[in-house]
Amino acid sequence: MSLIRPALVLFILLTLLTGGVYPLLTTSLGQWWFNSQANGSLIRLNGEVRGSGLIGQNYTAAGYFQGRPSATAETADNPMASGGSNLAASNPALDKAVSERVQALRAANPDADPRVPVELVTTSASGLDNNLTPAAALWQVPRVAKARQLSVEQVSQLVNQATQTPLLSFLGQPVVNILQLNMALDALKDK
């Protein structure tokens, strides 16, 4: 009987601490220090949400840069179905899917180098990746430039401007956010 009271008090204290104080503290600090990230890294244009800087979107038009293929079920880039394809490198289904993607990309990008960047034909671990390497974005430049009736130099310059490099080079590689790049293309068209 003498152990029940301290156990009950400890249970109530820990419940309040871990179920109330800690979540409120972390949420408050997140909103204060990392407001944009804590709210989904939303990208707005004229006050309207265009998407998240973290979640890929399915672009199919020739005048837009396309991101990595999505492994999400049924609907491409569906965040509710996030997950990789879980196909091993030795799986024939992966080989077939990659071959089909390579053929489709070569057909859609006849002026590009026949060596398709690997990230354009393989899914990311989350299936929702919105970033590409600059090389993969530059590979698509001839198609986008032709569809938008822009020079290759203009579109290449946009890719270079949209390239984000990590603060310290050993923390990652340079990336291009496809949503922001496509928004920059639309802004160029509106000028």
UniProtKB/Swiss-Prot annotation:
It comes from the Bacteria. One of its GO terms (cellular component) is plasma membrane. The chain crosses the membrane at residues 6-26. It is a single-pass membrane protein. Keywords: ATP-binding, Cell inner membrane, Cell membrane, Ion transport, Membrane, Nucleotide-binding, Potassium, Potassium transport, Transmembrane, Transmembrane helix, Transport. It is found in: Cell inner membrane. It holds the Pfam family KdpC. Its main location: membrane. GO terms for molecular function: ATP binding; P-type potassium transmembrane transporter activity. Part of the high-affinity ATP-driven potassium transport (or Kdp) system, which catalyzes the hydrolysis of ATP coupled with the electrogenic transport of potassium into the cytoplasm. This subunit acts as a catalytic chaperone that increases the ATP-binding affinity of the ATP-hydrolyzing subunit KdpB by the formation of a transient KdpB/KdpC/ATP ternary complex. The system is composed of three essential subunits: KdpA, KdpB and KdpC. Belongs to the KdpC family. This is Potassium-transporting ATPase KdpC subunit. It comes from Klebsiella pneumoniae (strain 342). The lineage of its organism: Bacteria, Pseudomonadati, Pseudomonadota, Gammaproteobacteria, Enterobacterales. The gene is kdpC.
